[in-house]
A protein has these predicted regions:
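Membrane-interface interhelical loops and short amphipathic "cap" helices
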Residues: 28-42, 97-100
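Membrane-proximal helix-loop-helix units in multi-pass membrane proteins
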Residues: 82-133
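Alpha-helical transmembrane segments of multi-pass membrane proteins
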Residues: 13-30
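Aromatic-anchored segments of alpha-helical transmembrane domains
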Residues: 17-22, 81-91, 142-153
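Juxtamembrane "helix-exit" motif on the non-cytosolic side of transmembrane helices
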Residues: 24-28, 65-66, 91-99, 126, ...
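Terminal transmembrane helical module of multi-pass membrane proteins
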Residues: 125-187
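Interfacial helix-start motif at the membrane-water boundary
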Residues: 37-56
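Membrane-interfacial loop-to-transmembrane alpha-helix junctions, especially the N-terminal start
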Residues: 5-13, 69-81, 130-141
Length: 187
């Protein structure tokens, strides 16, 4: 059963990565016009598919990875809040002329990205003493979140700035879920 879930998680992360890269071709990734939500104004159904696939892939990876911690269910409130954020993002247009929808969309997007990023960082923070690779992942996740926030404040939103932490999440969670942890045997 666990092996099946691992395979499903890897397949979801792979599909989400490929789909995100393909979806990003509708805009210029390093410009504001390449922001995932901006692309979604013209390609609403594709944006919805991207959102559902991204949320599902990250949540499945997070759920499996949290099974390696002593706090196996700690991810649940984060996933609920993140899911609510993604629902707000997908249900409301990123159109400044529709002010309420615009603000709800932005609120949802921020909730999804911030809460998911914090959850992944927390996961590796909890695992950091278990193995050095998790300490490295913890620092990596923290640095990516901080650098991404700084880039977002300086350059505004672009597809690359939005996608970097998502891709990092896919990679870090996939590696974590495929790793075998060393089991200490005491005699």
């Amino acid at each position: 059963m666990i092996k099946t879930r691992k395979v499903l998680s890897v397949l979801l992360c792979t599909a989400a990565t490929v789909y995100t890269l393909w979806y990003m071709h509708f805009g210029v990734p390093y410009k504001n016009s390449g922001a995932l939500s901006k692309i979604g104004l013209e390609h609403r159904i594709l944006f919805t598919i991207w959102g559902v696939l991204t949320y599902t892939a990250l949540t499945m990876g997070i759920k499996l990875a949290f099974e390696k911690t002593e706090h196996k269910r700690l991810y649940i409130p984060f996933s609920v809040i993140s899911g609510a954020g993604m629902l707000l993002t997908l249900a409301n247009e990123f159109d400044y002329d529709k002010k309420l929808q615009y603000y709800l969309h932005c609120t949802g997007s921020l909730l999804f990205s911030a809460v998911t990023g914090i959850c992944i960082f927390l996961l590796f923070f909890l695992l950091r003493k278990k193995d050095k690779v998790y300490l490295i992942f913890c620092v990596t996740a923290g640095v990516i979140l901080i650098v991404d926030l700084i880039c977002l404040l300086i350059f505004k939103e672009t597809g690359l700035i939005e996608a970097l932490p998502i891709f990092a999440g896919y990679v870090l969670l996939t590696v974590t879920n495929l790793r075998r942890d060393i089991v200490e045997i005491r005699i």
